[in-house]
Amino acid sequence: MLPGAEIEMLGGDCFEGSYEDHQIFREVFFGSDPGNTTKRCLVTGAINFECDSSKNVNSSLSSNSVVTSGYACPQGFEASASRDGSDFNTKAKRVKLSGNKHLDARDEKGSALHGFPTSDIARETIPLHLVESSNKGVSTSSYLLKHSIVKGREVYLGGIVSGKCKSLNLDKCDGKEFKAIASPVSQESFATRMISVGASTPHSEKACFPLQLNNGSKVSPNELIMSKTCLKIDPKEDPRPLLYKYVCKVLTAARWKIEKRERSAGRKHVDTFYISPEGRKFREFGSAWKALGGILLADRKLMDTGTKKWTGINDFWSDLSLTLLDIEENMKNLNLANTRALWWSALEPFVVVVFISKQVGSLRKGNKVEVARNSNPDKLKKEDTICLNLISGCPESVLTVSEGSHLVHDVDANQEIHSDLEVQTKISSQKVSSRLERQSIIGKEISGTHEQEASKGIVASKLIAEDMHESVMRKNLHRRSKKISDIKPASLDQHDSLDSNSLNSFEFQDKEMGNIHLVSKGSRDERLRNEKMNNSCCNSKKGRKKARKHYTQDDDLMGSTITRNKGKFSRSSQKKKTQKPKARTKKRNNRGGCRLLPRSSSNVENHFFQGNWSILGPRTVLSWLIATKVISRDEVIQLRDPDDDTVVKTGLVTKDGVVCTCCNKTVSLSEFKNHAGFNQNCPCLNLFMGSGKPFASCQLEAWSAEYKARRNGWRLEKASDDDPNDDSCGVCGDGGELICCDNCPSTFHQACLSMQVLPEGSWYCSSCTCWICSELVSDNAERSQDFKCSQCAHKYHGTCLQGISKRRKLFPETYFCGKNCEKVYNGLSSRVGIINPNADGLSWSILKCFQEDGMVHSARRLALKAECNSKLAVALSIMEESFLSMVDPRTGIDMIPHVLYNWGSTFARLDFDGFYTVVVEKDDVMISVASIRVHGVTIAEMPLVATCSKYRRQGMCRILVAAIEEMLMSLKVEKLVVAALPSLVETWTEGFGFKPMDDEERDALKRINLMVFPGTTLLKKTLYESTKPSTMKGVCLSKERNNPSNKEADLEPGLDKAGSPMSTQVESCDQMVPAGSDDEPSPGFPVPLGADQTEPTSETENPSRDSNANDRPNKTTVVSIGEEEEEECLQKDVSKLSEEGKETTRASSSSAALEEVSGLGLGVVNNVSDEMLLCVDEQLDSDSSQDSE
């Protein structure tokens, strides 16, 4: 210790800190006892730990002394301790041990560090004390200097201990000198309330402040037994038992079980199993811990998702002790889900370090350990954190880069980091300042050098980072990292210099050499454009073959990368100038389409625990509404009389149904309506919640949330070169070298189209051409000229189909190429939402999603929309339970929701408009689901069929398929096609009667837009045997279709060689039929749904019944261009359609809509109820959505 005289000299002339000040302080707090016979404070009663050899030495007032402190109060340390160190305006000094200095140290200003012994008394342990008052009460501090200090440790000097203090353990010292670094209290972490001291200290046990625990805490035999009065934590002890104790408490609070089982005979080891509340067993602790976190954090967002860092075991124990104290104080609230989630998040970093990554040994060595909060942090955020640490140049870390060359790109922040990056063993940041305005970054090149050339280090200009929260690293540093000083110099391959335009961002990208380049974003875009121009100039054949460019990870190598595989990139053209260019093709790619894969039963549980649905709950609309939190359990539901709005029945909503108050039975929602005397076969408009809110409004509210989530969940991924074409074949769904359509994004394999050579000139796919003349049908043409059939989706020229320029005004815009498509369309639309009872209490119904059009509709249509869309959301859960998610790599579209919600797309392969969903239910519980799409009367496809896991192997799928086949046969659909997995081909063929297709039938289907999956097998089943020739063969074997050149017709359609009108045989998708049959096509024009009957097609037209309609001669229908014959054919068609309207009305008498309009002739197509208008509006919505896309 320093002599008292020297201490007085250090005090200066100021009174504060002088000997007199210290004497007054001692008299106030310790009385005027001259001999200091008592060691208890007069104010607080705290014991003075000062030893006899240091009582009258004025050294404890120095702010640079080692401090251990605590608050004195009658209830103990924990009751009065403050957890916020910011309440005290104190400062501390951090002492970092140096290996080449003595304990007789001085700080940067040359002042001696008070409180440290010289080397001759370094082996003594000198306790000092200090009692201070503050707004929190009176605090006492005990200053301890042990006989040794460990080299490389950090010691905090001075200040009042707060709730975030670091524990001090001053171990052996080699007589080295300290280096003191002043820092404010708010920027340092402090010792915990319980201070550990060495065993050699005489008053170590008294100086230790106990870590108080609740008296009610129970400790199981498998956990660490803790003392109720004092817990002495030694950083060198194993932290696993203590941490495991609290982990077990969190698991037990979450209703998990921990079982120990002995291994087989002869082994003394015991296995531990962690069992979830659902009965799932985990052998590994890490998997159980992550599963617990996934359940607790499923519906919650934690604010703290950063990282935690510790340097040494002392720092780790300091943070852990505070966390455990907080958990112990709030242990009684662990029965709350929010509290369990909070404490799981608090313990997660410690559990990862101790049990999962097992880095305790690294902490004991004094190394720095960093761990992310939560187990599954976002990958991009993780990359941002790594790159920010690299750029900021932390003093304790070294900026490392990959062996590859990098481009720095994409930094946008509200703070700027001025850093001089010097190529040495360490790159540090010199200055960090915040700024709101955006700055520019001048690109400079930094090349790595050897250590011998470190003095010549190339220094980059100021590196200004903007918006640290955005991504600053777009490529993973996945190669072996090394210091910049170890990277050998390398030169650029093609570009000697980089543009110095302003940068908006940085980008790290890889190259085989070890350079870092700072490049401007503007120059990068300009260089890309130049590369494209150069490539187009170099290729002798411009635009012949469209290939997706694969950019390398260095823009300076862009040119060489784009032109790799040059043999496949472009097709050499012949030198003949008269030869027409070939059709465009795409370079071979391996992306392809999505494969149909079933979900294994072991992954089903994990899939549904991550979402809102529970696999154990029933698949009903009520259960879905409860899961979406639109309605709550035990909420009152009422059935009211539509006449006087009086309550007829009342019940309580549960997950299993409705508890009827009159009979106290749990029934389904349909039985509840039937119990009240209402028809359960149609949407109920008089069903209300207890709050007065209509039940249909609750369904629409839940559907709105589902619609937004699904629509916003997918994104359109554009190709790197803005290639608009698809990456998958429209026939087989696989990738490869593809032929591009010149009108739409569709692409095809040449072999799938059965083409021997590429067609010359522009080439158009079947979705863009007329099905009669095979010429392009423009989407921008007026509806009166060209149109698309609303049922089979085939396109036609108006002149090709009817041969005349006269057309009727159509409202709404629903077109048909023939009466067969119209009958199929009306038959399916009239069955939407209708419940068809079956045996054993089962029922089936057809559903179709009603799009969001923003229009005002009738209450009946809104109720039907709410019912159908809600059931489709439930059906989607069964599909997702049965199949793995199929996200298209080109567009990002999740195909299964798009199929069930019949959403359209600009990509023909992903255009699922026209799909219907057929479901089988029992007591409102959905059992089986199938998606179907009917392409006229030619063929219907059923790509997806699924059954709820609870009802599998009970024949439910067979009941569903039988209902679909019966419905299609009533609509006279010829064939049903399924895409079968290889493992289920035998089941479909032997159990359901399907057969493989021959080559001719597969070729006939190539023009039809089927939903196909790579690796599946197409199977067919004949449903309706017609007397007409095979429409499948007739459709695709016409003369024009077999000519792939798309040459112009020699003669104008409808005219002979002399240019006069001629008789033209109609060849629509369903018109190769004998005359006089029920399947006869409409003569002269496509029949629209809802045709305006107030405007006749001619003055002499008078719709009347044709009594001899069935006595027509059996010959092929020929349309005459003459005016009189046209009017006569029109009258016959109107008369026949009137009778068919009555037959259709009688067949679907269960629909209230058709009952209202029976007997109205052709008006049955126009004056229909809300169900029919719904289908029309839906078609309009689909068209508008496609136009918007």
From Swiss-Prot:
Low complexity bias spans: 1147-1157
UniProt-annotated stretches for the region Disordered: 475-498, 523-597, 1031-1157
Phenotype of gene-disrupted mutants: DNA hypermethylation.
UniProt subcellular location: Nucleus
Tissue specificity of this protein: Expressed in cotyledons and hypocotyls in young seedlings.
MF terms in GO: double-stranded methylated DNA binding; histone acetyltransferase activity; histone binding; zinc ion binding
Family matches, as SUPFAM superfamilies: Acyl-CoA N-acyltransferases (Nat), FYVE/PHD zinc finger
Pfam families cross-referenced by the UniProt entry: IDM1_C, PHD, TDBD
Gene3D superfamilies registered for this protein in UniProt: 3.40.630.30, Zinc/RING finger domain, C3HC4 (zinc finger) (3.30.40.10)
Main subcellular localisation: nucleus
InterPro entries recorded: Acyl_CoA_acyltransferase, GNAT_dom, IDM1_C, TDBD, Znf_FYVE_PHD, Znf_PHD, Znf_PHD-finger, Znf_RING/FYVE/PHD
Keywords noted in UniProt: Acyltransferase, Metal-binding, Nucleus, Repeat, Transcription, Transcription regulation, Transferase, Zinc, Zinc-finger
Catalytic activity, EC: 2.3.1.-
Zinc finger intervals, PHD-type: 726-771, 767-823
Basic and acidic residues biased stretches: 523-532, 1038-1050, 1102-1114, 1129-1145
Domain note: The PHD finger domain specifically binds the N-terminal tail of histone H3 and this binding is inhibited by H3K4 di- or trimethylation. No effect of H3K9 methylation on the binding. The N-terminal domain (1-592) is required for interactions with IDM2.
Protein name: Increased DNA methylation 1
Source organism of the structure: Arabidopsis thaliana
